[in-house]
Amino acid sequence: MKRKTYLLFMMLCIFIASCTTSKTTISQSANLANYQYASLTDVMNYHGSAALMDAEVKIYDAIENSRLQMVGDQAINELSYEQKQQLLLVRFGVTQNDEESIVTVNFVDYFSGRPVASCRGAFGLGIDRQGDFNGAIKRVASQIEKTFPKN
């Protein structure tokens, strides 16, 4: 009986520890339906961080699974004025500690520089940093797909 109680207690602790908040914040004045394009900014500005390089690949994939069409930095100048009005610049950040990993992806209007949406994915079992990171990436990807659903 003690063993079952101990096992149940451990599973409950793991469950509670993994319950971190993933959420999306959308600007009150933003109409996300107006946006069709996205471009990652500051590409290759990682200062040697392998985690950020890995995150960029996975964030790019997540955005491609939404309705937003990815546009490279060099291709922005080829967009028409109307297309630039539908363009979001994408910035992201990764924070990790022993308890959890957090991945935040911010979407900023190209012309105004105003943040219109921020998606946050967090995950933490505290057992394996890479596992927590992958969990946070999956959660932020889910938030992006919900925020910019395919039509």
What are these model-derived regions, one by one?
Residues 14, 33, 83-85:
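Structured loop/turn residues at beta-strand edges in well-structured enzyme cores
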Residues 1-19:
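Sec-dependent bacterial lipoprotein signal peptides
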Residues 93-126:
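Amphipathic beta-strand/beta-sheet edge segments enriched in Tyr/Trp
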Residues 53, 57-95, 99:
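Short, solvent-exposed, polar/charged sequence segments at loop or secondary-structure edges
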Residues 17-68, 150-151:
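A structural "domain/chain start" motif
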Residues 20-33, 65, 116-151:
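C-terminal/domain-edge helix-coil "capping" segments
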Residues 48-56, 98-101, 126-137:
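Solvent-exposed, acidic/flexible segments
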